[in-house]
From Swiss-Prot:
It is an enzyme of class 3 (hydrolase). Pfam families: RNase_HII. The lineage of its organism: Bacteria, Pseudomonadati, Bacteroidota, Flavobacteriia, Flavobacteriales. It catalyses: Endonucleolytic cleavage to 5'-phosphomonoester. This is Ribonuclease HII. A divalent metal cation binds at D15, E16, D107. Residues 9-198 form the RNase H type-2 domain. The keyword Manganese applies.
């Protein structure tokens, strides 16, 4: 894990979570870490267990120079598509920062310019740069918390466990109970995604 993209300028890392889900928002975070920040556990959120993610969430919130988290909800996802919604969520997370960075590094290969600030897309960046890894952790933990909250309203879909991803269990629940207000209507839920092969 590289500490910093460039120590001579202020760099924000950005990442999103929930892009491949059938339900819930897409959530993004942007993080600017201090140059002296170090943590051996920090890595891509997908590789960490729940305990480590929650520990790092608190650590990042305490030690980041500034961070922002933003959701784009189902209606907007359906209107502008999931790729644009993911980029919009990252833009909104950047807007929440206390100040603009000199440069933005983004996990993945697609991004639209934000306020004329130079940016670079880095494939698997959440496993390469600490600020992107930190953003991936905040995006995932904030989104997971939201999904656990709405699980109480619709427990049949078990969002507490699947977080809205298209698991067999989730697809079976959609087939049995239909879609909710939290489902993304732009995803083709019928018939292919409802085929369940046990």
């Amino acid at each position: 894990m590289l500490n910093f993209y460039n120590t001579k300028i202020t760099v924000a890392g950005a990442d999103e979570a929930g892009r491949g889900c059938l339900a819930g928002p897409v959530t993004a975070a942007a993080v600017i870490l201090p140059i002296e920040f170090k943590n051996a556990v920090l890595n891509d959120s997908k590789t960490l267990n729940l305990k480590n993610r929650n520990f790092l969430k608190s650590l990042i919130e305490d030690e980041a120079i500034t961070y922002g988290v933003a959701h784009v909800f189902m209606k907007e996802i359906d209107e502008i598509n999931i790729l644009n919604a993911s980029i919009l969520a990252m833009h909104r997370a950047l807007q929440v920062l206390k100040f603009d960075p000199d440069h933005i590094i983004v996990d993945g290969n697609r991004f639209k310019p934000y306020q004329k600030i130079p940016h670079e897309c880095i494939i698997k960046g959440d496993g390469k740069y600490m600020s992107i890894a930190a953003a991936s952790i905040l995006a995932k933990t904030y989104r997971d918390e939201f999904m656990e909250k709405i699980h109480e309203e619709f427990p049949d879909y078990n969002w507490k466990k699947n977080k809205g991803y298209p698991t067999k269990e989730h697809r079976a629940a959609i087939k049995k109970y239909g879609v909710t207000k939290y489902h993304r209507k732009s995803f083709k839920l019928l018939p292919d995604q409802l085929k369940i092969d046990f």
